[in-house]
Amino acid sequence: MRILLVNDDGIHSPGLRALAVALQGEGHCVTVVAPDRERSAVGHGVTTRDPLFVQEQDWEGIPAYSCSGTPADCTQLGLEALAKGPVDLVISGPNRG
């Protein structure tokens, strides 16, 4: 299954990496796109006026990207540009909060 994994705690959240590794270990094709910092409590906010910056992360075989935007921005970028091909499932989490 092709999975897009996002969160609101940021790309450096240990739970995010653990889930990505576990999903890949089960044979899934995982792409991670997460905010470059903690972005809890922004709801469904999207960035409309500022440019978004994306940086590829070194996650040892798992495509992973940090984004300067909100979790919703990360989801949209993942679905429209960063995931290689169509996505079967989007998982948002895990969440420390």
Residue map of PLM features:
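A cross-family phosphate/adenosyl-ligand binding-site feature
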Residues: 3, 17-86
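Short, glycine-rich nucleotide/cofactor-binding loops
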Residues: 6-12
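Short glycine-rich anion-binding loops that position phosphate/pyrophosphate groups of nucleotides
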Residues: 9, 38, 70-71, 95-97
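Short beta-strand segments
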Residues: 33-34, 92-95
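Short, Asp-centered acidic motifs that coordinate Mg2+ and/or phosphate
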Residues: 89
